[in-house]
């Protein structure tokens, strides 16, 4: 079954649930809809994902090679004076082993030479024959954190990716056996390693996709509540929400609603309805670990991408105080392929030749205006 077919199933389930419970709110069991609380603005730690975006589905689609010099120059232009820009380095797959860890270490060092901080997404994505082997997985997490966490420019780790999303194994870990257990074990293992390194302030979290089906989403959070140990709860610093209005959920724009409306509702439901199911409270920060909009003909123009970026960032900053939102990451820096057909081929602030789209300047202005110094 394709990624799009799974989305159709999810849409049908959500529509059916909404029809049965039209008055559902953040207090309802299925967390279908909610109005955001009264706005309490705050500053945000901003970041972006450089490199290649993962393609939806089983394997990686077409992506033009990264040009390191052009990427570095773009990042230097994007970071305003007096503001920090964090780089979210995705796709450190378990099946990449020590060789991939070394490549990530080289990337971290290269970015650090330009004065940029990095955070690392450690993917479950198991090697052949190791799926469900949590002891081996924990060893990989410890090795990755030991090698990368000792670097002063590494500020955070995200353990696993979108484990509530059981499709698209190239981008999400939810397709793999024992993925939720892997996240819990991985966070504990990472925390132990960071303490041994003398770096307990490096932040640890996990990410969820917004969204799948009501039953699956509810079960995910309830199962997490049962699996979470006291050590896990002490180790967890943040939950990252990966929200793509008009691309993933909702798959098309809803008349009368802005991108910011969709992002604010997603964060309200995660904070007020889903996290309580796992007994995760205000001690855990909320991040937007991925948000992006494509510039795809027939879907969205470059001007439309810029408009949706501004709407989303403004919504996040407006509710930073009341929802405990501390961080926002745009996905991605550059298009994989500006003429590509994948969902995520054209989500960059730059075209594939590194020329800027209008959203590039808008994001820089947003960082300068709303960013934490």
Map each language-model feature to its residues.
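Aromatic-lined carbohydrate-recognition surfaces of secreted/lumenal glycan-active proteins
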Residues: 183-221, 276-296, 323-335
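Bacterial N-terminal signal peptides
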Residues: 9-19
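Substrate-binding cleft/loops of secretory-pathway carbohydrate-active enzymes
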Residues: 209-240, 334-342
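Aromatic-rich peripheral "rim/lid" segments of glycoside hydrolase catalytic domains that contact
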Residues: 32, 36, 59-78, 163-164, ...
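An active-site-proximal structural segment forming one wall of the substrate-binding cleft
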Residues: 107-112, 116-118, 130-159, 175-194, ...
């Amino acid at each position: 079954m394709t990624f799009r077919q799974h989305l159709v199933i999810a849409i049908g389930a959500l529509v059916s649930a909404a029809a049965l419970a039209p008055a559902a709110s953040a207090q309802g069991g299925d967390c279908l809809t909610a109005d955001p609380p009264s706005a309490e603005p705050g500053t945000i730690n901003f970041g972006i994902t450089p490199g290649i975006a993962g393609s939806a589905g089983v394997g990686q689609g077409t992506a033009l090679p990264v040009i390191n010099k052009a990427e570095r120059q773009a990042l230097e232009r994007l970071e305003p004076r007096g503001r920090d820009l964090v780089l979210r380095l995705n796709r450190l797959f378990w099946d990449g082993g020590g060789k991939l860890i070394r490549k990530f270490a080289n990337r971290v060092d290269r970015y650090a030479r330009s004065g940029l901080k990095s955070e690392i997404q450690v993917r479950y994505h198991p090697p052949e024959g190791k799926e469900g082997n949590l002891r081996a997985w924990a060893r990989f997490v410890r090795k990755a954190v030991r090698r990368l966490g000792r670097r002063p420019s590494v500020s955070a780790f995200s353990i696993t990716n979108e484990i509530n999303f059981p499709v698209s194994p190239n981008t999400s870990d939810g397709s793999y056996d024992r993925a939720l257990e892997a996240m819990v074990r991985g966070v504990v293992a990472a925390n132990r390693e960071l303490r041994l390194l003398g770096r307990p302030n490096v932040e640890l979290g996990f990410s969820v996709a917004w969204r799948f089906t009501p039953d699956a989403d509810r079960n995910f959070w309830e199962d997490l509540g049962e699996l979470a140990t006291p050590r896990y709860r002490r180790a967890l610093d943040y939950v990252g929400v990966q929200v793509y209005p008009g691309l993933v959920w909702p798959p098309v724009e809803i008349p009368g609603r802005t991108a910011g409306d969709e992002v604010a509702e997603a964060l309200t439901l995660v904070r007020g309805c889903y996290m309580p199911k796992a007994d995760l409270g205000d001690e855990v920060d909320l991040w937007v670990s991925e948000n992006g909009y494509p510039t795809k003909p027939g879907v969205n123009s470059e001007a439309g991408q810029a408009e949706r970026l501004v709407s989303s960032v403004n919504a996040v900053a407006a509710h930073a105080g009341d929802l405990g939102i501390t961080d926002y990451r745009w996905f991605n820096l550059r298009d994989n392929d500006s003429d590509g057909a994948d969902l995520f081929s054209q989500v960059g602030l730059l075209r594939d030749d590194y020329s800027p789209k209008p959203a590039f300047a808008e994001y820089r202005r947003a960082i300068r205006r709303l960013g934490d110094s």
